[in-house]
């Protein structure tokens, strides 16, 4: 009986030690990255910030995976130095009431800085970073659109030996409308 209690106490001590060790290193990691959890939790928009961080993280990956998140990134905007979700249903109202929205800032109006440094800042909380993200995502979207347009034209010319002209216009029109819709 005494042996069983001794093993139980040692097991509990080991578990507490492992948990303490993990907490210490997580705190150390957060301090190294200048990440303050209290600031985020007070804003009540953690899910939005998480989405934005995921979006930023995806930028370091290969093209097809990045394109999957284009719409996810487009659904955010920056107001009063905080990343906020955008509701599509009130998009026009927001555009009228928030003329300084980061979505509407031209690239040259974005605060100047090293784009790479801004893009990969671990926990962005300001508009300039978001502006750089939007600019980069726009370039990605344009590149993707041109690539698909070219492929559709090549596919159309290869397969239109006996086909009509209406069949060739379909993919291009749908691509263009998709591009305009995603571009807001």
Curated annotation (Swiss-Prot):
One of its GO terms (cellular component) is extracellular space. Residues 1-20 form the signal peptide. Keywords: Signal. This is Uncharacterized protein CG1552. It comes from Drosophila melanogaster.
């Amino acid at each position: 009986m005494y042996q069983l209690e001794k093993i139980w106490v040692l097991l509990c001590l080991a578990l507490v030690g492992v948990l303490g060790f993990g907490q210490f290193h997580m705190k150390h990691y957060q301090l190294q990255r200048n990440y303050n959890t209290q600031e985020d939790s007070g804003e009540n928009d953690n899910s939005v910030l998480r989405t934005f961080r995921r979006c930023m993280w995806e930028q370091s990956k290969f093209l097809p995976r990045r394109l999957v998140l284009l719409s996810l990134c487009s659904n955010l905007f920056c107001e009063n130095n905080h990343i906020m979700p955008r509701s599509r249903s009130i998009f026009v109202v927001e555009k009228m009431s928030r003329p300084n929205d980061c979505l509407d800032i031209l690239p040259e109006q974005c605060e100047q800085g090293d784009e790479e440094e801004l893009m990969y800042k671990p926990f962005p909380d300001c508009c300039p970073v978001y502006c750089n993200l939007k600019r980069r995502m726009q370039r990605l979207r344009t590149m993707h659109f041109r690539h698909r347009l070219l492929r559709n034209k090549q596919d159309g010319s290869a397969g239109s030996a006996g086909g009509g002209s209406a069949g060739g216009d379909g993919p291009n029109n749908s691509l263009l409308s998709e591009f305009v819709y995603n571009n807001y």
